């Protein structure tokens, strides 16, 4: 079964190793089609011209508009593959990750009696030391599987926090409240049913996506086995909001537009393609996560005012 992998990168030196790890550790690399969006300087561009797995779009980093826009562009490279996977450009993979994810998706679909399942969770952690990777395991970054619940984060954006599995034997995937954008695995139908919003720049993207997916019948489960790694925080690596990459000060405007759009989605002012299909379904999701998202968000806006 074919897998389309969406990978957006912003001036990320980890990108080539991410793509190599993805392909080399798959049981069936012949089934992989990878949509890469490189946002970088011309001299930084990775040459994938001889990699038959990769379809790509390159844009100069000055035209970057955040993760949402880049992930939306990556989805435009999808060509009807059976499965859709979204990763960050600083990821690593365990052997057989593709076979394991398809199997765990089947387990989750069986538990839920619903084939429209999104697998998502916080990946394990790694860091790049010189020319090799090192696994990081500590209280903040455990190696065992966890679920996620919606969190009002310290940045005053909606994010997620880790929650332990109910079944500590980790026999089957368990339901979660929201997605992690750096690891999504679902049927390929997700691309057309829930296209990525290009106008949500970065912070807060995941709750809006979870709202749109869940209210369209896609339930979110966390895999019962960890199969990939993420380079968290990445000190001294390029970020689009860093001063050196934001000399024209456009990031603040993009984030303001993004936050306003998120608020409209939370309140139900935006319904349809870019929001929940209806207010009743939106409220069902808030009941599911047991959180008054628009109320908390409005309190924050009032505090700022």
Q: Residue spans of the language-model regions?
A:
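Catalytic cores of eukaryotic secretory-pathway lumenal/extracellular enzymes that build
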Residues: 2-299
């Amino acid at each position: 079964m074919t897998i389309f992998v969406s990978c957006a990168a912003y001036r990320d030196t980890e990108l080539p190793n991410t793509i190599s790890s993805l392909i080399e550790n798959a049981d069936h690399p012949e089934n992989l089609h990878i949509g890469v969006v490189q946002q970088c300087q011309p001299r930084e561009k990775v040459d994938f011209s001889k990699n038959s797995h990769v379809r790509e779009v390159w844009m100069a980093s000055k035209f970057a508009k955040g993760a949402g826009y880049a992930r939306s562009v990556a989805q435009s490279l999808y060509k009807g593959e059976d499965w859709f996977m979204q990763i960050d450009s600083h990821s690593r993979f365990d052997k057989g990750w593709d076979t394991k994810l398809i199997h765990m998706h089947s387990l989750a679909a069986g538990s839920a009696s619903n084939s429209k399942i999104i697998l998502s969770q916080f990946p394990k952690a790694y860091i790049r030391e010189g020319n090799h990777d090192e696994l990081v395991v500590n209280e903040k970054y455990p190696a065992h599987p966890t679920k996620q619940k919606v969190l009002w984060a310290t940045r005053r954006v909606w994010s997620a926090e880790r929650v332990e599995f109910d079944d500590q034997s980790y026999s089957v995937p368990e339901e979660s409240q929201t997605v992690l954008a750096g690891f999504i695995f679902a049927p390929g139908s997700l691309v057309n049913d829930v296209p990525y919003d290009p106008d949500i720049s970065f912070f807060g993207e995941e709750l809006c996506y979870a709202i749109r997916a869940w209210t369209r019948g896609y339930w979110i489960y966390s895999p019962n086995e960890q199969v990939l790694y993420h380079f968290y925080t990445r000190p001294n690596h390029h970020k689009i909001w860093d001063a050196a990459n934001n000399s024209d000060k456009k990031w603040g405007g993009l984030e303001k537009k993004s936050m306003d759009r998120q608020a409209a989605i939370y309140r139900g002012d935006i319904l349809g393609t870019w929001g929940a299909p209806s207010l009743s379904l939106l409220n069902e999701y808030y009941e599911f996560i047991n959180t008054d998202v628009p109320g908390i968000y409005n309190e924050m806006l009032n505090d700022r005012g």
